[in-house]
Amino acid sequence: VGNLKVMMFADSFHPHTDGAVIAMDRQAEGLERRGHEVVVVAPDAPGRKPYPRRVHYLPSVGFKTYAGYRIVHTPGDVMEFVRKEKPDILHCHGLASMAILSLTAARTTKIPHLITFHTMANEAVKYYSPLPIRDDMIVPMVWLYLRGMLKRTEVVIAPSKPIKDELEANGVCMNACEVVPTGVDTNVYSPDNHDKDFLKRFGLDGKPVALHVGRLSHEKRLDIVLGAMKDLARDEPDLHLLVVGKGPAEGHYKRLASDLGVSDRVVFAGFLPDGDLATAYASCDMLVIASTFETQGLVVLEALASGMPVAGIRFRAIPEFVHEGVNGCLFDEESCAEAVRRCLARSDSMRINALATAREYSVDACTEKLERAYALAAEVLARTH
């Protein structure tokens, strides 16, 4: 692949951060390291900060049921911008208004187009639909929309194989589907970031600490982890849980911790900047993730790269990266506490294996896969038009 100009379209963008925003940033950095140019088309938002690459902002409005998310309400001058920039690739990181906009631009200009399937939209709609429609009615409508959308792009990128399988199982016909995980930067996330003073900030020095990282929303299912902390009170009385992240369900989870009688062993740290987050991974004993919403679970790879065993739910993308008894333990809803026990008991060997897993998903290795997906998109376009 020669040097490309890639135009990325983002439904979700800074100052809001979620998995899709982080994935897009990492992929853009990986491409730039390899000599490609990346420009971004994104919804404008209050409080925007400087960004390390050119961004073309479009007028947008806030999405009332999902704080921080914005919907582009007019196409603005996006067609003029695409024609002026003459990108080689249009890559959309979203399934809503930007997917429609970027597909329209791709069809008009005959530029190869890809969509990364970052979000299980069929499940997100249960939590965030602005319409008072029952799940059994709205979920089929979402799949209908997704089938129509994803068959029109040259390549669908799935962040993990289970997501590709799930799309195919739900009757999504795609020109091509490539599995391209988002890479983890092992220079940023590393056991070298261990800092014995970090846990002192939270009064946790000298204690075993499990870490939970993610937006505090209902679909992340922190309630399962809090329930496990109650179960672990008897045989792991010193174990504490450090919860990193903010979100709309924060108050709910704090009340639940209190109701379960585990408030004294759970610390809500709020949002941590990247440097502190890397230190948190390297300084705690293990990561726990109970979300069934993950298309990849970026936090899992960040933890593994930091030499941290992971207790993860046996669902969707998580078992792709967490291997039972090797670099962590898998659990079902009712067996989270037992998985935490197993990780704590065998953490030394799991730490070594965690690092080996992370190396397979380096930014460079994943960027090569992305380049191959771009080449495939050009082939598909040439073949079908």
Predicted segments, located by residue:
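Conserved acidic donor-binding segment of nucleotide-sugar-dependent glycosyltransferases
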Residues: 323-334, 342-347
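Short hydrophobic beta-strand element within catalytic cores of glycosyltransferases
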Residues: 309-312
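Carbohydrate-associated surface elements
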Residues: 162, 183
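Aromatic "clamp/platform" in nucleotide-sugar-dependent glycosyltransferases that forms part
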Residues: 292
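A short, well-ordered alpha-helix in the C-terminal region of glycosyltransferases
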Residues: 348-361, 372
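Nucleotide-activated donor-binding/catalytic signature segment of Leloir-type glycosyltransferases, i.e.
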Residues: 252-272
